[in-house]
Structures are given as structure tokens and as C-alpha cells.
Amino acid sequence: MLERPSFPRLGAGTRHHRPLGQTGEGSDWLLAFTGISGIAGMMIPYVPWGLIRAMQRGSIELTSPRGVWIFNCAILPSRLHRTVERKGNMKPDQDLFGKVYLADCLCDRRLRWLRKSDFQHTCCAWCQCHNIRTTAGPSSRCPERDRGELCGCGPARDRCRGGGYGRCLCGVGRIQIPTPNRGFPVLLRGGKPCRERVFHRSSSHAAGFLHEEQLLFHCVCGQGHVGYLGRGRQEISRHRRVDQRHHWTQTPKDCFRQQRGGVLGATRERCLYARQKRSPSPGRHPALGSPPAQLRQDHLHNPHRLSSRLHLAWVRPRTRHQTGPHEADPGHQRRHFRAAGGEIPVLGESGPGDRCAGRPRGFYYLRGFIGCESFVYEHGWVEPQERTWNCGFVVERGDGVVCGAGVEEEVGEDVQGRCY
């Protein structure tokens, strides 16, 4: 009968066969293992659960704008949003190291690092009908489903008062909040500011004039108000109703000036042209009239020169049953207007001589773009008596390629690296 071979127990010495627990190498390893386990157990409460939660939600930028790695997620997005909704001044509840905050950017549902001076850049996106949490919570009403009602902006009576929400001029369909003593903040897109800093603090302020860094924006109340950004003012400097008779905004007589990088591109010639008092005619728009011959020829013969011009194309309104991007109406005469300043045209009502005669009334957007990105300028108008489905607005490149539709539900998500 064979005997079972005897093997030394784990931890026992090979020479003297000391059992586990007595003095020897085995007890040393056991003590070391116990110590390491105890230290690890003590460190468990300090695991950055907020960071783990953020990683589960999607990608997260772990570096601050200054390149400092921070692993503290003490400010939860829900708490941050409640603070924003309650105070309205974007002040955080807690100061993380006095420099950087973690904020839940609703533009693309990612967490972003913001400096204390840039905390106002936290943006909230249009609802998109995709259950995106807004400042008012998941029960916020979608603008597309509620005929222009904005998500997370509170009662309609609070939207046009001082310090209300303003449409971001970057053209992504996001919303900015004017902040005290800073005018309009620069929007963080993908962790970086917009490609052109068009929201700088105004160098000089005069009521009724648009200066180099004092831009026009459309209040999202849906009533056609237009606000002008002032310097050192805690509220929107002024709102103006859209002229319902002519359907274009009575903007100041000053013009957009040439920005660094050729964003707005309002040369003196175009400024003077836009300010001229011309009577409306079938071939002219009541706001801008006919462009000068030199500019018209220059545009026709150089369709790819998009450096600093705002190319606008009118499209048919968006109906309730349309879900995809809509094309430019082939039966509708397309024209390119240079919204350099002066009066900005907004079409919408049927009338004698109106190029949109017979078209449904609704929400029209004007957008300028650089290259293939919607950019710089937009203005909205809604007839208060009849809030119809939001009408879209597309931008068209010089070679005739339609870059995309300017409808909120199509531009709010996944806007990085694509035309929209």
C-alpha cells in the first residue's frame, strides 16, 4: 500500500518543517500582508468616488486649464445646478483649492475643470428632448416640444429681466449667463474657449451702440427681445422688441467693427453701406437694400473667400412633422446678406412684396459662419400671437454645400469635429 507523500505546509521551513504561525518566514509574510490590508482598508473612504462616477458617465478631462491634476469632486453637479438656479450668479458652494472647480457642463454632458475666474463659463444646453438634466431638473420642458419654452430657465416672467439668459454667440445652440462686471463670458467648448474671443468685456459703453467688444444677442424668452452687453453692468443693458411691422430689429446705427482674426468683418465700406437709408424695393431688403456692385461681384467671383463674411441663406420653415435637417427651398429665392451691422433682417410674416409670402410664421434664425462652423451671430424672432414650430436656418458654404441645419435638437450634441 502506497503512502501519501507528505508536503511541507505553506509557510513551513523546508529544513525543520516549522508550522505556520511560529517564528519563521511564514509569520513574517503574514504580518506584512495583514499590515498592508489594514492600510488599504483605512484608505478606502478616501477613494475619489466622484471621479469614479464621472468616469462611469463618460469621458472626463482630468487636467485643469492650468495643467494641474486634481482628483477632488466635492461639488456634485446636482448641487452646483441648484446653486446656479437659486443664486443666479454662478457662485460655487465650495472652493476647491481656491483655483479650480469641477462643473457639469450640460452642453455635452461632460465634467469640465473651471478656474474660479472662469466659473461663469458653465453652460447649460437646450433640452434636446434627450432627458438631459438642466438647471431646473429632469422635469424641464423641451423647447421643441413646448413651442419655444426654454429648459431650466424658470418662469417666463424672469427671462427678460436683468441678468437673464442669453444665447451664446458661438452658434452651437448653447446658453450663456451674463455675469457681473464681466459682460459676456467666453464659452468653454471642449475644454477650450471659442475659436475667436468675441465675448470680451466692452472697452467702452454707450447706450444704443455696438462697439468692438459689445455684441448683440437674442434673449431666449421667445418674445423677440434683443439685449446689448454693457461694461460693468449686472444686468442686460437693454431689450428691444422686434419691429413687427417691418420684421427686422431696430439695432443701433453703429456697425460691427473688424475683430481680431477677421470674425465679424465689417469694413468701413460695408458699415457705411449698411447705415444708408434706402427705401425698400422688390430687389432689396428693407434693412440692407442691395449690396454695392463691387461687393456683389467680389462675392460672385470668389465664392470660397469666407474669411470674414456672414453668408446667410433663407430656408423654408420647419414643420411639426419634419425631423431631419431640411434643405433650402428650391422655389424660394436665396440671397446672401451681409449682416455687418445696422438693421438685421428677420423674415416671417406674409405680406405684399415679402419674399416669404405664404410661408408659415415662426422662429427664424440668422447665422453667420466661418468655414464650416456656425458662428458669431444669431437673432431670433417669434410672433407672440402665434407660436408655431421652430423654423430652422442653415448656413451655406460658397461652393453650395449646406453645412447643416440651425435647429437646437440637431446641434446640441456631438458638435466636435463635424459640420452642424
UniProtKB/Swiss-Prot annotation:
Induction: Expression is positively regulated by the sphingofungins biosynthesis cluster-specific transcription factor sphG. It comes from the Eukaryota. Keywords: Membrane, Oxidoreductase, Transmembrane, Transmembrane helix. Its EC number is 1.-.-.-. It catalyses: 3-oxopresphingofungin + NADPH + 2 H(+) = presphingofungin + NADP(+). The sphingofungins A, B, C, and D, show a limited antifungal spectrum of activity but are especially effective against Cryptococcus species, fungal pathogens causing opportunistic infections in human. Ketoreductase; part of the gene cluster that mediates the biosynthesis of sphingofungins, bioactive molecules acting as sphingolipid inhibitors via inhibiting serine palmitoyl transferase (SPT). Sphingofungin biosynthesis starts with the PKS sphB that produces an C18 polyketide precursor 3-hydroxyoctadeca-4,10-dienoyl-ACP containing one delta-6 desaturation and one delta-12 desaturation. This is Ketoreductase sphF.
